[in-house]
Amino acid sequence: MLNIFSLICLSSALHSSSFFFAKLPEAYALFNPIVDVMPVIPVLFFLLALVWQAAVSFR
């Protein structure tokens, strides 16, 4: 069981590390700034929800 779990973790770690260093094809190079900002968007939604709840006094 532990071997399967460690294999899954190792596989996902290797996959994610190659994912972070991947480059867009040359035809889509103009979208690089947008792609760099995209991972931050869920954090912005979380902050928006937090500010919204603070505005209504966390009802």
Swiss-Prot record:
Propeptide residue intervals: 1-22
Positions of transmembrane segments: 38-58
Primary location: plastid
Subcellular location field: Plastid, Chloroplast thylakoid membrane
Keywords of this entry: Chloroplast, Membrane, Photosynthesis, Photosystem II, Plastid, Reaction center, Thylakoid, Transmembrane, Transmembrane helix
Pfam family, one: PsbK
Gene Ontology cellular-component annotations: chloroplast thylakoid membrane; photosystem II reaction center
Membrane topology term: Single-pass membrane protein
Origin superkingdom: Eukaryota
GO BP term, pick one: photosynthesis
Subunit field text: PSII is composed of 1 copy each of membrane proteins PsbA, PsbB, PsbC, PsbD, PsbE, PsbF, PsbH, PsbI, PsbJ, PsbK, PsbL, PsbM, PsbT, PsbX, PsbY, PsbZ, Psb30/Ycf12, at least 3 peripheral proteins of the oxygen-evolving complex and a large number of cofactors. It forms dimeric complexes.
NCBIfam families to which the protein is assigned, alphabetical: PRK02553.1 (NF002715)
Entry similarity comment: Belongs to the PsbK family.
HAMAP family according to UniProt: PSII_PsbK (MF_00441)
PANTHER family registered for this protein in UniProt: PHOTOSYSTEM II REACTION CENTER PROTEIN K, PTHR35325
Function: One of the components of the core complex of photosystem II (PSII). PSII is a light-driven water:plastoquinone oxidoreductase that uses light energy to abstract electrons from H(2)O, generating O(2) and a proton gradient subsequently used for ATP formation. It consists of a core antenna complex that captures photons, and an electron transfer chain that converts photonic excitation into a charge separation.
Protein name as catalogued: Photosystem II reaction center protein K
Source species: Piper cenocladum
Taxonomic path: Eukaryota, Viridiplantae, Streptophyta, Embryophyta, Tracheophyta
